[in-house]
Amino acid sequence: IWLMLNIFAWAANQVLGVFSHLTEEGSRITGATYTTVNATIPVTFIMAAITAILGVILGLWIMKSHTLEGSAPIAARASEALKAWKVPTVAIASAIVVSLVLTVAWPVLLQRFRVNPNAQEMESTYIQRNIDATRAAYGLDKVKAEQYKATTEGEEGALADSAESTAQIRLLDPQIISPTFKQLQQSKQYYTFADTVAVDKYDVDGVSQDTVIAARELDLDGLDNRNWVNDHTVYTHGYGVVAAYGNQVTAAGQPKFFEAGIPTQGKLTDSEKYEPRIYFSPNATEYSIVGAPEGTKSWEFDYPTGSEGATNTFKGDGGPKIGNIFSRLLYAIRFGSDQILFSNRVNSNSQILYDRSPKERVAKVAPYLTLDGRVYPAVVDGRVKWIVDGYTTSDAYPYSQMTDLGEATKDSTTESSDTVSSLNSKNANYIRNSVKATVDAYDGSVDLYVWDQSDPVIKAWEKIFPGQYHQLSEISGDLMSHMRYPESLFKVQRELLAKYHVSSANQFFSGEDFWQTPVDPTESQQAQQRDILQPPYYLTLQTGGSSEPVFSLTSSYIPAGSSTREILTGFLSVDSDAGHEKGKIGSSYGTIRLQELPKDSNVPGPGQAQNNFNASADVSKELNLLESGSTNVQRGNLLTLPLGGGLVYVQPVYVKSSGSTSFPLLKKVLVAFGDQVGFADTLDEALDQVFGGDSGASAGDAENVGDTTDDKQDAKNDDSADGKTNTDGKQDTPSNTDGKTGGNNGDSSGTMSADLKKALDDAAQAMKDSDAAMKKGDWSAYGDAQKQLQEALNKAIELEQ
């Protein structure tokens, strides 16, 4: 009986196993094909039936063999046994022969002699199933595609109808300007910023502005006096965020900050309830012990001011209390530190903060979610919040194309950044951005919000963990305004859409209209040979179908294959503005728009646009002059924008001197439209060059046209004028949008001395002389001006200290 049951179970398993063919990876598509449906699956049912019959035969044989008389002569019993074995032997042998014929020979013969010669016709039904399922599983079934007949001839005034989009073109490259943030806003060597700052949007003076933003995190590697007390009880947190306009720079090429300084001042933190302290962040230390007895002096370092600095005591609920000896012993063992057990800094009010990375905290709360590779800060309702996107995934969606999420989300940013990563490598054929998570930078509290309420997977997890999730209605308007379309999901979708924009099974089979994401042309030749893809970019622009400019995530396509002729075939964007209403996602959020260029289009792709820049004699000459001195040229992200009836390429060019304390400054902007190239000190001027002398719209840096001197804000804000990090432990004067000094509680009076003002004026004049000499190619004068600049900056630093 046991043998029969096992045989029946195996047969049943074979029947149930046919469903695995629906997610089987084939050479062309995922899912069952003609041969699978017409040979493999029927054969499976036949073999299951044969196996069941065989089980019955064996069962009957076993029962019959037990009826042999035990008292019969041995010879008689042997003869009977031999006869009895004939039936099962023949049955098993027959089953093996039938199995070989049906499961091996028949599918192979069918595929080779019937399917392969007529593959396009015979596989079309199953390819169509794959197309439809893939689009549904990856959220591509509602893509708004349109033909975009792009011109390559730039005409005067062509951008007049795109004035708002033109004004918002982002100049600051989030991958390049982190060193600039550090030098101008780090304040002290024990603070740092992410190596790739975030792009977000904020309402500034009633106008939505693309913004580059970063949190000032703690970095103990920059602390001179390292010991257990300092590392774990004194230097416990970072302080504030720094934000700059994405589309504007100062005349000197520095970011134009609207939230800066320490203590933080600016447009984002004018609320009295603002909490700037950052105890939880991606770069936070392994653990900190916070809390002090009532009535005692605070010992946590808060921010630099005066000769000693301000102090603070943590007042939140961010970690376990370790006031009793047993808790101290446990954590001393966990972290391998006897100081936790014996230090007087550990008291009855002490808490220990650990697992401080926002992504790590969300993973602890919801380990079943796949988390986005980027965590970004936002100032929400007076607090700094880290926003983490969570995905539900599956590899069991019938007929949907399987994708390696890790490979699909790699690009030049993830390859070069320590703070942005691709998704963990795993196969999936269904993905939804079903969860938005926030982590409070002060107390580490984690809030999970159900974002995609139609996702059945997250509905199941809600039932398993009741009360773990907040509903959409609980998202405040301020938080909603910073919920953006996540990059990792978009990168997965753009990889699939490169093929699955094709809706016809016959066209899909031919593969003639397949696309690919271009490699990043700003990377080294070696990186381009490794097919390091161009990342998507957040931009505010107006695309086909949208009535006004929208904060969007964008990418582009070129033809698939290895052809050296790189033309643009498509422009992809998704509306990333979730609106600002409490509990309500903006109606256009998540709308994916695909602008397909005609097959005979000759609009250059990103790689060709970069080649056009490199081939321009004027551009090459000036860049070579810049690089021949003591400076390095860094080319920023190459942005693609559907403007002026065609595609505009914009690339900021940064210059960085070779000194150890130097930082990138935006000095030039490259623009291309068709084969026309513009190259100027400002984006506004470069656009005019490719559009007949007048583009018809003003860029964000239009006010800098004709102005090569440092502006008033930079002359007043010493931390954005000296370009160096103060490392002596004394207070830097913070900058703010009003150009005033402030935030000093120590020896500074808050006003600028005449000597300091003169030193800064001398620095500004030296920068002006440097620019003038550089344009003339007079490198002797340029060297003299740089020397004068260094002397003026050193004098300014000395006076400030």
Task: Describe every region a protein language model picked out.
Residues 1-732, 736-776, 780-783, 789-800:
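Soluble extracytoplasmic regions of secretory-pathway and membrane proteins
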